């Protein structure tokens, strides 16, 4: 946030982040949490998925990996696919533990917001401070995810959501993403 020049009250943000922490900590941490679970870390070999880059894994809530995979900034999965994959996930999870769907979705939405903020922080640091272009290019996609998330209310975090809405409305984040797509024009060709 500070890099954008936005003004905000740090103590109010801290209060909302404490509330978020309390909500997230309601979830069990008794499962393996990949932490960087995204499509580029899943390889298909002989028709079977193989997982790479899991050295940062540890015990944690399974919601985080679901949020990481299904709300990847550049993946732009449609809601219909997310819903289908969430249903598949819950069916598989039911083999190991009972699932209260209402609670599942209630907790998941908080993890999706948390993961989106974590991604924006990482992209901002690696892009704007370490000057890595790939991360700068990824920021608008994560902002678009955040914009979509904020269409649904998070009454637990009123100040945070107001700041995030202001952030998503900044000029540098309101450009049409289609303008950012690469277009290659071949003007001559020889062989």
Residue ranges of model-derived segments:
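Secondary-structure capping and boundary motifs in well-ordered enzyme cores
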Residues: 29, 34, 58-59, 105-113
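ATP/Mg2+ or Mg2+-diphosphate-binding catalytic cores
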Residues: 121-191
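Conserved catalytic-loop position in the HRD/HxD motif
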Residues: 36, 53
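ATP-dependent phospho-/nucleotidyl transfer catalytic cores
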Residues: 1-34, 43-45
């Amino acid at each position: 946030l500070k890099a954008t020049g936005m003004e905000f009250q740090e103590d109010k943000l801290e209060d909302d982040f404490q509330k978020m922490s309390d909500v997230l900590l309601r979830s069990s941490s008794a499962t393996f949490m990949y932490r960087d679970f995204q499509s580029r870390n899943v390889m298909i070999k002989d028709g079977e998925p193989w997982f790479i880059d899991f050295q940062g894994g540890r015990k944690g809530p399974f919601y985080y990996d679901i949020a990481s995979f299904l709300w990847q900034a550049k993946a732009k999965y449609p809601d219909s696919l997310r819903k289908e994959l969430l249903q598949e996930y819950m069916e598989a999870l039911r083999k190991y533990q009972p699932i209260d769907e209402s609670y599942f979705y209630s907790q998941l939405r908080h993890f999706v917001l948390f993961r989106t903020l974590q991604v924006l922080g990482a992209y901002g640091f690696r892009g704007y401070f370490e000057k890595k272009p790939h991360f700068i290019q990824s920021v608008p996609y994560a902002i678009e995810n955040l914009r979509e998330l904020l269409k649904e209310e998070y009454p637990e975090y009123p100040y945070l959501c107001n700041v995030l809405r202001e952030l998503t409305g900044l000029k540098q984040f309101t450009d049409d993403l289609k303008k950012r797509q690469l277009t290659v024009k071949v003007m001559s060709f020889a062989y």
